[in-house]
Amino acid sequence: MGLLCSRSRHHTEDTDENTQAAEIERRIEQEAKAEKHIRKLLLLGAGESGKSTIFKQIKLLFQTGFDEGELKSYVPVIHANVYQTIKLLHDGTKEFAQNETDSAKYMLSSESIAIGEKLSEIGGRLDYPRLTKDIAEGIETLWKDPAIQETCARGNELQVPDCTKYLMENLKRLSDINYIPTKEDVLYARVRTTGVVEIQFSPVGENKKSGEVYRLFDVGGQRNERRKWIHLFEGVTAVIFCAAISEYDQTLFEDEQKNRMMETKELFDWVLKQPCFEKTSFMLFLNKFDIFEKKVLDVPLNVCEWFRDYQPVSSGKQEIEHAYEFVKKKFEELYYQNTAPDRVDRVFKIYRTTALDQKLVKKTFKLVDETLRRRNLLEAGLL
């Protein structure tokens, strides 16, 4: 009797194990099948190109966005951005006051000098204190000093971030004791991407049957981060390359002798030459157009070596469009130097973008989705 019970128990255990093994195998097969239908997108670009802002927009647009815990995690980041920015402006003002022939306009008031020294010391720390109302009032006083405003106008020479004005105009709210960052604050927050981050989404919603599912990879743009891209190159459906077209008069954070636009040109050329991208589609985002359209009327495009042959033709909106089309053509020429014009297995599209403009980013990704779906249908012989 005991032997029969033992055999029955072993038989039941074997059956359970077989059932579990079959279930695991079924899940693995399902995941492998689902994985085949996920399109891989690689988000590339030099440092400060705005690609990480694009990445955050995708999370807001096509996923659940940021929960309260994630929003709160940006508080120290945003406060650090404030301290770093005001230190850059203060130290830059001191440098201009010492070295410029018209140094008088860079002379701080006695009140600003005292505030500035304290803030510069805080900005040089490894750990920043939480932004308080008292500190924010000091920062606001310093920010409004005419000498700081003169320095800010030369921000391209000092690595002053694009978010400076936004941060300074929101100091009161950012320093509130109960402050929780808004979605807009998170988009403006500057954190250098290190390593690789990824997100999975569908531009048409959660229902995977209604459209393509994409896995988007964002990688560090600074030079020392680029070696981490290599293992991501295989099996990519498309490269989304971000080029900050407003940065034609700026230098790299990591190499102040190198023009940012020249770095972007060389990086784009290098990526195009990679054998693993021979049949990969390229979506070029000419980003930061909002800054470009203001800057190009004041700072000649031909200050950049790549744009030496640019000739202005007009003023106002007409000149902005002329300058934009010139830059666009330069990138097109670079692409076709690396790709035969009659290639049909490699799609190339250019989009004018502003990473902070959510409506524009949404519209752009819908267009990218349509382009890639059409390519898939062509490859399948359905078009």
Swiss-Prot record:
Family classification: Belongs to the G-alpha family.
Binding site for GTP: 48-53, 162, 187-188, 193, 221, 287-288, 290, 355
Molecular-function annotations in GO: channel regulator activity; G protein-coupled receptor binding; G-protein beta/gamma-subunit complex binding; GTP binding; GTPase activity; GTPase binding; GTPase inhibitor activity; metal ion binding
G5 motif, as annotated region: 353-358
Region (G4 motif): 283-290
Lipidation (S-palmitoyl cysteine): C5
Coiled coil spans: none
Region entry Disordered, spans: 1-20
Binding annotation for Mg(2+): S52, T193
Protein name, UniProt field: Guanine nucleotide-binding protein alpha-1 subunit
Keyword entries, A-Z: Abscisic acid signaling pathway, Cell membrane, GTP-binding, Hydrolase, Lipoprotein, Magnesium, Membrane, Metal-binding, Myristate, Nucleotide-binding, Palmitate, Transducer
Tissue specificity of this protein: More abundant in roots and/or leaves.
GTP-binding recorded as keyword: yes
Annotated region (G3 motif), positions in chain: 214-223
UniProt domain G-alpha: residue ranges: 37-383
Function: Exhibits a fast rate of basal nucleotide exchange. Guanine nucleotide-binding proteins (G proteins) are involved as modulators or transducers in various transmembrane signaling systems. Together with GCR1, may regulate the cell cycle via a signaling cascade that uses phosphatidylinositol-specific phospholipase C (PI-PLC) as an effector and inositol 1,4,5-trisphosphate (IP(3)) as a second messenger. Promotes abscisic acid (ABA) responses in guard cells. Involved in the blue light (BL) signaling.
Deleted gene: phenotype: Hypersensitivity to ABA and glucose (Glc) during and after seed germination. Altered response to blue light (BL). Abnormal roots architecture; more auxin-induced lateral roots. Reduced H(2)O(2) concentration in melatonin-treated guard cells associated with impaired abscisic acid- (ABA) and melatonin-induced stomatal aperture.
Record flagged with keyword Signal: no
Quaternary data: G proteins are composed of 3 units; alpha, beta and gamma. The alpha chain contains the guanine nucleotide binding site. Interacts with RGS1, THF1, the pirin protein PRN1, GTG1 and GTG2. Binds to GCR1. May interact with ADT3. No interactions with RACK1A, RACK1B or RACK1C. Interacts with PLDALPHA1. Interacts with CAND2/PMTR1.
Positions of region (G1 motif): 40-53
